[in-house]
């Protein structure tokens, strides 16, 4: 080979190495995502977590952020619940740190365990999506505009996620979320079912076991939910009918209805004229500098936030997720140059879904394919209120019936639900669809009632703890118990561990107290006997002259008291130890459950923990940025 040929070969080899080098460097394994420590974590073993970015579109630098929590126990089979918040453009870290996740913030620095978190019997996967939401990032020019784009993007994410974490792919899979996720979830479910039908997926045995959907206070059917604003506020007494202000709201509602009756808009997700109804209601409630909270009508907020500052945990979440040590712990890419915000206005502005049909049109097909769906509503939410959801269900047709018809003209009953003796809500179900109304709950039901929402989840997933033990929750539908569920009272749950630890400490103190009482009695008896002995010795001394006061021991007085005192002390120690009944402690459960590795055991293991370790993260915060909740604000 001549010089020119050699140079060409060298150049070709250099190009090949340049092309292949990035792939060899950037390919990641599960160990790269392992969360070794979490700043502010509560005492006790760290829950098994993975977090970080997965690139879904190299050409647009599109990266989605995820935070995964492994289940604490497996009741009968492994399950994974994927949680999505709405907006559009609102981060699912809302769900992780304020709703269904295992931790909640006490302040900007400190996390605490949540009793009733959804990770007890299911793996939880929180995803900031679409691109641009929360910790996710990418080219702003390529933010998604339609719901089918969003679903395609999410399926790509799942494909890549399961390649890194293949041991979770066979799990029963559920999608859950709230608010605008009522649009996301049906579209994603449809995309997953269509994917499962592909020949290459079936040939490679990579079918995803989609088992159900859960949507809370979902924005699903604009055609039914926009008109529900007015009857809801009348029903709840927020607006007084017949007033001048009420007439103004009714005029806005009439204009919306006119738009909804136009054929071109019946299949539209976002209708600006209809958005004016909610704004008119908020203006009506404007008193001084306050207005009603659109997410919980029992509360007020600064005007014109009207709920954007709620829940109160928000003031701590943004500073916490912008701390440098937290950013490092969660493996946030350096390419993510802006700090975390709850809702990205640019994402919401882009995703208007002008050519997307509302998700309500997908629900009948999903139900008819045998996919169970649960819709739940908080009674005190205005923005995605239960009146609109119930009207949507009432008019929806699937599987040969309308709404909750069991047969023509016969409707499934609304069943009373009680939880631990208190009225909790209503259940209604037919033909794969379940509806749950939570009494006295807001837009974010798990924020208000984590234990009740977990009970609902366990019922829907079919979790039954009968064969693994635990204190069952007293949850009844029309007075009857269903499968035995445990909400924070499982013997290996974090909350139960704290209770058992307290029991153990109490038992120990009782045992010590009891042994102390016995020792006191022994000392009193010994003192009395000593007094009698001295008295008798002195009487002898008075009758026969001075002798040692320890005549029977054959000891002189020098140093003898110390020796007898020593013997008495040892004897007392033996009696005290003998009187300490160790069975009182043996009756209490072992502290072994306080260690995650020992409490889970092989029976509950899903995958293996990474052995990699990292140095502790450094403290500090990133600069603060403005926060928006998106235009719709349906987070």
Swiss-Prot record:
Residues 1-27 form the signal peptide. One of its GO terms (cellular component) is membrane. The chain crosses the membrane at residues 515-535. It catalyses: Preferential release of a C-terminal arginine or lysine residue. Residues 472-500, 579-635 are annotated as: Disordered. It is a single-pass type I membrane protein. The keyword Glycoprotein applies. This is Pheromone-processing carboxypeptidase KEX1. It comes from Paracoccidioides brasiliensis (strain Pb03). The lineage of its organism: Eukaryota, Fungi, Dikarya, Ascomycota, Pezizomycotina.
């Amino acid at each position: 080979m001549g010089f020119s040929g050699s140079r060409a070969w060298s150049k070709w080899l250099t190009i090949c190495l340049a092309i292949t080098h990035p792939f060899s460097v950037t390919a990641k394994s599960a160990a790269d995502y392992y969360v070794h420590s979490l700043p502010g974590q509560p005492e006790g073993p760290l829950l098994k977590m993975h977090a970080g970015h997965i690139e879904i579109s190299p050409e647009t630098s599109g990266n989605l952020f995820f935070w995964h929590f492994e289940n604490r126990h497996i009741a009968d089979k492994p399950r994974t619940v994927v949680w999505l918040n709405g907006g559009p453009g609102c981060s699912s870290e809302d769900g992780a740190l304020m709703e269904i996740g295992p931790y909640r913030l006490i302040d900007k620095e400190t996390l605490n365990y949540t009793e009733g978190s959804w990770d007890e019997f299911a793996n939880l996967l929180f995803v900031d999506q679409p691109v641009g939401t929360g910790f996710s990032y990418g080219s702003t020019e390529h933010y998604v505009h339609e719901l089918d784009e969003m679903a395609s993007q999410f399926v790509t994410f799942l494909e890549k996620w399961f390649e890194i974490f293949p041991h979770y792919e066979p799990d029963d899979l559920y999608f859950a979320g709230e608010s605008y996720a009522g649009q996301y979830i049906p579209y994603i479910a449809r995309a997953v079912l269509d994917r499962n039908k592909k020949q290459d997926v079936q040939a490679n045995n990579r079918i995803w076991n989609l088992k159900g959907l859960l949507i809370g206070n979902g924005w699903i059917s604009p055609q039914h939910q926009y008109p529900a604003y007015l009857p809801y506020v009348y029903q709840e007494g927020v607006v007084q009918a017949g007033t001048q202000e009420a007439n103004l709201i009714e005029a806005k509602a009439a204009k919306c209805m006119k738009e909804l009756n136009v054929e071109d808009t019946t299949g539209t997700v976002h209708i600006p004229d209809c958005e004016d109804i909610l704004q008119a209601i908020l203006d009506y409630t404007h008193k001084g500098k306050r207005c009603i909270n659109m997410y919980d009508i029992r509360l007020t907020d600064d005007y014109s936030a009207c709920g954007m500052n709620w829940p109160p945990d928000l003031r701590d979440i943004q500073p916490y997720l912008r701390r440098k040590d937290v950013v490092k712990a969660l493996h946030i890419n350096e390419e993510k140059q802006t700090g975390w915000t709850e809702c990205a206005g640019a994402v919401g502005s882009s995703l208007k879904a002008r050519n997307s049909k509302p998700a309500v049109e997908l629900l009948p097909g999903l139900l008819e394919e045998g996919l169970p769906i649960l819709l739940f509503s908080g009674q005190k939410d205005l923005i995605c209120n239960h009146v609109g959801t119930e009207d949507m269900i009432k008019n929806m047709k699937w599987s040969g019936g309308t709404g909750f018809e069991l047969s023509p003209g016969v409707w499934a009953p609304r069943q009373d639900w009680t939880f631990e003796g208190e009225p909790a809500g209503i259940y209604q179900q037919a033909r794969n669809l379940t509806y749950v109304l939570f009494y006295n709950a807001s837009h974010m039901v798990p924020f208000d009632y984590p234990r009740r929402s977990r009970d609902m989840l366990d019922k829907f997933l079919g979790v039954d703890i009968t064969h693994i033990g635990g204190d069952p929750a007293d949850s009844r539908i029309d007075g009857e118990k269903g499968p035995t569920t445990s909400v924070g009272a499982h013997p290996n749950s974090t909350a139960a561990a704290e209770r058992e630890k307290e029991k153990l400490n109490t038992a120990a103190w009782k045992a010590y107290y009891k042994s102390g009482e016995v020792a006191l009695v022994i000392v009193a008896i010994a003192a009395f006997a000593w007094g009698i002995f001295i008295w008798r010795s002195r009487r002898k001394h008075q009758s026969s002259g001075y002798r040692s006061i320890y005549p029977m021991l054959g000891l002189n007085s020098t140093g003898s008291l110390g020796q007898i005192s020593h013997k008495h002390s040892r004897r007392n120690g033996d009696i005290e130890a003998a009187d300490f009944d160790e069975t009182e402690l043996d009756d209490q459960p072992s502290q072994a459950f306080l260690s995650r590795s020992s409490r889970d055991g092989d029976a509950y293991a899903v995958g293996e923990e990474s052995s990699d370790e990292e140095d502790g993260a450094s403290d500090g915060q990133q600069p603060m940025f403005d926060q928006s909740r998106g235009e719709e604000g349906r987070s």
